[in-house]
Design a protein with these regions (language model features):
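Class I SAM-dependent methyltransferase Rossmann-like catalytic core
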Residues: 2-31
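S-adenosylmethionine/decaboxylated-SAM
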Residues: 21-257
Length: 257
């Protein structure tokens, strides 16, 4: 699909790479996902791919973004207007929980914002909902503690390099070459040495362990607290706790976190 529609060339700095999106969508199809909740659409590159996927498969797409940059948000909404996507404006700590109240759809949760441990905690909390089948997060870079923590939650590889174990099918190879050319042409900040999107199949892992994951890095918003707030409708409390924690303790460090 990405090659057919020439979507590789539309990639912009900071977005999920084409092969990373292809890997995510393939895992969703294998798991029988019928709804994808995306948090963090930025300029809408990955959301556009999700929209094309929805057109072809009928999978429901919910895309959440804070939209603090109104001009950027307007451009993004205009580009995505032709796609069957529910565009939600709001805080992920509230809106992911609201989207998960639809219990009759096998769901994947993809987080590209917020970042860091807040995102990991949101994903782990999502696993407490039985309809959630796939958890995925972007910006899991080499050397980051979040990368290792997320990978350790799974009983199988979460990054495509190890999951595919050297697989080089025709379409995958052509997509990789198109991506390499793109990286060189645009002078991308990162290369293809290591993918930064992890994809975890909850059915092949320990759901209870994921939902109850614990770490001091979660600060005042661990997965169990988030899951409780979502199930009891205390969405605003989560937003308050996350914002207050960042005010009192400072925002999470990004590099090496």
């Amino acid at each position: 699909m990405l090659l057919e529609l020439k979507l590789v060339d539309e990639w912009g700095e900071g977005a999920i790479f084409p092969r990373e999106m292809a890997f995510f969508l393939t895992r969703c199809q294998t798991a029988g996902v019928t709804q994808i909740i995306e948090s963090g659409r930025q300029d809408g590159y990955s959301t556009r791919i999700l929209g094309e996927f929805a057109k072809r498969t009928g999978v429901a797409i919910v895309s959440i973004d804070y939209e603090d940059d109104k001009e950027r948000a307007e451009r993004c909404r205009k580009m995505l207007g032709a796609f069957p996507i529910e565009l939600v404006t709001g805080d992920a700590f509230e809106e992911i929980g609201r989207a998960l109240q639809v219990h009759d759809k096998k769901t994947a949760v993809l987080i590209d914002g917020p970042k860091n441990w807040g995102a990991v905690s949101l994903l782990c909390a999502s696993a407490s909902f039985p309809q959630v089948a796939i958890l995925s997060m972007h910006n899991l870079e080499e050397g980051y503690l979040t990368r290792h923590f997320f990978a350790d939650l799974s009983s199988e590889p979460v990054f495509y390099e190890k999951y595919l174990d050297g697989y080089q099918g025709d379409a995958w190879g052509r997509l990789g070459e198109a991506e390499r050319v793109l990286i060189d042409r645009k002078g991308a900040a990162r290369g293809q040495n290591s993918s930064t999107i992890g994809v975890l199949d909850v059915a092949n892992s320990d759901r209870i362990r994921i939902a109850g994951a614990a770490s001091s890095h979660f600060r005042s918003y661990p997965p169990k607290f988030i899951g409780w707030a979502w199930r009891t409708g205390n969405y605003g409390l989560l937003k308050f706790v996350f914002s207050a924690t960042n005010r009192w303790l400072g925002a999470e460090r990004y590099r090496g976190c």
